[in-house]
């Protein structure tokens, strides 16, 4: 029986690895979309000697130092600049960094799963990120290699959980780096505070005091990456511009950078339930299964004080609070759109850990009696079936024909890039925001928006017919003379 289980485990592990490879390969060839292109302007400008600056397409269409509208931070974009400095292809080279973080995310979940509830928990946890569906809206996560900050932030949060029991200071630093991958990672702090409290010895006020003693250094270190970034911004911009930068950052954080019709909590929860490659009711049922197993496990260990139990409770409590912070904020933030990208760092980091907690709960129940011993595995099998269904759905989605791919974009942009090089055109204006952004960045020109004052007299790239003279044309895009 043990041999059969071992064979089954490794066959399933190999199948899951194959699914990851298929999704990664599909993601590398996916359309280079506007948010990725907007992010790529920062490492390009840094290498061009213009500083840590975007093209400012959403900030007046001028070179903008430490642009607050770039929500993907230096934790991601500085490594991208390092890769590009060695002459790597701009798009594929840039996408290697999120891919590295994706691998780190899966590896961290495997470590947590193995440590907490054995190899089967590790396998299920490694499947959860594949089950998440970031597509389906105008601001997607297309896959593991998108040049965005959500996956890197999630990976760093997971590794913070890995090191927290023995190196809380390092966990704090990793959380700080996650914040500088995506500012929304700040919402993870309450979860880590609760995790530290669970690990602290004593009871009552003594435990709170111990938590404060253990938590001050990680909290300080969590702020170090952001402090360094803002110090660099101060010396790059000067006092007056730095104050404007802070105001812009505060405005962006408060407003989410979007102006949409107010959304409701039911709409948000419905969107989250639909963000998996299974029907929403299956996603909800899976969540209920996880909660039942976790609660059952916690009830089963009442009165036990083993270190292994405390570590499991730490993970469950910290991840539950972390997940609630992300989903709760997003659900109640009426000014934010129905984009699962917003809570994605918390979903990708903490939901898989809660699945680990569910498997741990099943194991704890197995020690309580015949009924619990039979019920736990049945619920885990149902949980596993849901994940298998979702992962297969993700793999099947990669076979759906795409209207545009990275390869087709390259072919469309080739004549425009050649024209930009020959004419030395420094800027092109995108008309409108959206599909026209990425071709401009791929052409090698700086990108602005057609209606910005700074773009007066600048040629415009569009997918529509030109109303002025056509300067150069590809199969999908063309450059029109300035009106």
What are these regions (language model features)?
Residues 9-13, 127, 173, 219-224, ...:
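Signature aromatic-anchored transmembrane alpha helix within multi-pass, membrane-resident enzymes
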Residues 149-150, 181, 187, 333-367:
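Hydrophobic/aromatic-rich transmembrane helices and adjacent perimembrane loops
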Residues 156-170:
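Membrane-interface transmembrane helices that cradle and orient dolichyl/undecaprenyl
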